């Protein structure tokens, strides 16, 4: 009985924490979902962005007190413009989805929304972490050894 309780608590903690992808697992997943070369953006750049935005964590969130918005998920997609969290003033919801969809272990919705973000004129430059950590840098290390 104790073993079942411990197992239940372990499983509960896993579901609360969400999925933190291993580097190569995420690279393969993003490639399968059509991110490599999407709008001219290499898979290595997407991997660099995800590393510095969320640490590959699907449940990452970050509140922005200045505009009272929140960044959600593996790509840290913002509730001011891209998703609806029901609490961000003046939200646009350009991806037409709930922000909670960006926190799922299945990242298909997050990928679809990230593709929507880069179709705007700013492209991948919409992400501050990409500009600060990935732009004009050798990002091959993020996919090295992954066979992608």
Swiss-Prot record:
Clinical condition linked: Amyloidosis, hereditary systemic 5: A form of hereditary systemic amyloidosis, a disorder characterized by amyloid deposition in multiple tissues resulting in a wide clinical spectrum. AMYLD5 primarily affects the viscera, and the predominant clinical features are renal dysfunction of varying severity, and intra-abdominal bleeding. Inheritance is autosomal dominant.
Highest taxon of the lineage: Eukaryota
CDD domains: LYZ_C
Compartmental location: Secreted
EC number: 3.2.1.17
Principal location class: secreted
Signal peptide segment: 1-18
Note: Lysozyme C is capable of both hydrolysis and transglycosylation; it also shows a slight esterase activity. It acts rapidly on both peptide-substituted and unsubstituted peptidoglycan, and slowly on chitin oligosaccharides.
Name the record gives this protein: Lysozyme C
Nuclease as UniProt keyword: no
Positions of disulphide bridges: 24-146, 48-134, 83-99, 95-113
Family to which the UniProt record says this protein belongs: Belongs to the glycosyl hydrolase 22 family.
Keyword Protein transport on entry: no
Annotated ranges, domain C-type lysozyme: 19-148
UniProt GO BP: antimicrobial humoral response; defense response to bacterium; defense response to Gram-negative bacterium; defense response to Gram-positive bacterium; inflammatory response; killing of cells of another organism
Database matches in SMART domains: LYZ1
PANTHER family to which the protein is assigned, alphabetical: LYSOZYME C
Catalytic activity: Hydrolysis of (1->4)-beta-linkages between N-acetylmuramic acid and N-acetyl-D-glucosamine residues in a peptidoglycan and between N-acetyl-D-glucosamine residues in chitodextrins
Gene Ontology, cellular component aspect: azurophil granule lumen; extracellular exosome; extracellular region; extracellular space; specific granule lumen; tertiary granule lumen
A GO MF label: lysozyme activity
Organism (species): Homo sapiens (Human)
Entry keywords, A to Z: Amyloid, Amyloidosis, Antimicrobial, Bacteriolytic enzyme, Disease variant, Disulfide bond, Glycosidase, Hydrolase, Secreted, Signal
Assembly and oligomerization: Monomer.
InterPro entries recorded: Glyco_hydro_22, Glyco_hydro_22_CS, Glyco_hydro_22_lys, Lysozyme-like_dom_sf
Function in brief: Lysozymes have primarily a bacteriolytic function; those in tissues and body fluids are associated with the monocyte-macrophage system and enhance the activity of immunoagents.
Catalytic residues in the record: 53, 71
């Amino acid at each position: 009985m104790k073993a079942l309780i411990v197992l239940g608590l372990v499983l509960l903690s896993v579901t609360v924490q969400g999925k933190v992808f291993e580097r190569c697992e995420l690279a393969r997943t993003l490639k399968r979902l059509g991110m490599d070369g999407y709008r001219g953006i290499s898979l290595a750049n997407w991997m660099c962005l995800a590393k510095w935005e969320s640490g590959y964590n699907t449940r990452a969130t970050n509140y922005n007190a200045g505009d009272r918005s929140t960044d959600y998920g593996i790509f840290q997609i913002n509730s001011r413009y891209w998703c609806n969290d029901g609490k961000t003033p003046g939200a646009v919801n350009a991806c037409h989805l709930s922000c909670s969809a960006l926190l799922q272990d299945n990242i298909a919705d997050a990928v679809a929304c990230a593709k929507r973000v880069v179709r705007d004129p700013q492209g991948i430059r919409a992400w501050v972490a990409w500009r600060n950590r990935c732009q004009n840098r050798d990002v091959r290390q993020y996919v090295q050894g992954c066979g992608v």
